[in-house]
Amino acid sequence: MAYLLGIDIGTSGTKTLICDAQGLVKATATAAHPDPSGDGPGWSEQNPEDWWQATIRATHEVCKKAKVKGTAITAVGLSGQMHGLVCLDDAGPDEAAALRPAILWNDQRTVAECEDLEKAAGSRARLIEMTGNPALTGFTAPKILWVRKNEPDVFERTRHVLLPKDYIRYRMTGVYATEVGDASGTSLLDVKARGWNRELIGKLGLDASLLPECFESHQVSGKLTDHAATKLGLEANTPVVGGSGDQPAGAVGNGIVTAGLVSATMGTSGVVFAHAA
């Protein structure tokens, strides 16, 4: 029998789930992360390596609980905490140590950079028109601007920026990729065109090559490398789909896909989702 593996990179831990092709859940598992920390007021950071090690532990644990061999997993889907910033150089996926701790979704250091972002766009209204959102301190683009301004040595060495779950995707597949759900929370996506907003990226003076390829959530973004498969106890070349950020994925799972439906999620954060016609 074929099984599917879901991996969610949360704030407090990484959660895994195995289900069959009909969606029947066989088992779940969780591996905890160290609590977020930071050296400044309002800072919230984690070490991306901790996410990867938790992914390894939780994957082995869920296979054990489900009594499913890793070779029976036919596809992997990813979700995770949104908006975070992981800075990488060109080191390969087998190591892929981040250049600095990841700046998380609940980090509040970027008030000035949010102002810079709106100025670059032309106005708050224009930024909303371009990306679907105003500048928010938790979003990714202000974090990139903060690193450029305050840690120029790190920024100069940065060749790729990834969201948390997409760092795990890179460790699994060697592919720099994201998908439209998570990318919509970066302040850099043209949500109507479903691709990076090249105009805004240019106005910010950023190199578009920093950003990963953007897939749809259902598309295959890459396949497990031999190294990752060995670490995870899975089969090499297993496809990994785009997935989504944790909140959009949860909303779809709750059936918030038609007008008039609303969901509320209370976790490390509180989020209300409504379908917009």
For the regions a language model picked out, list residue spans one by one:
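A charged helix-plus-loop insertion that forms the helical arch/lid used to bind
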Residues: 93-109
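Acidic-glycine-rich active-site phosphate/pyrophosphate-binding loop
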Residues: 27-30, 34, 112, 217-231, ...
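Short beta-strand scaffold segments in enzyme catalytic cores
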Residues: 14-18, 84-88, 187, 249-252, ...
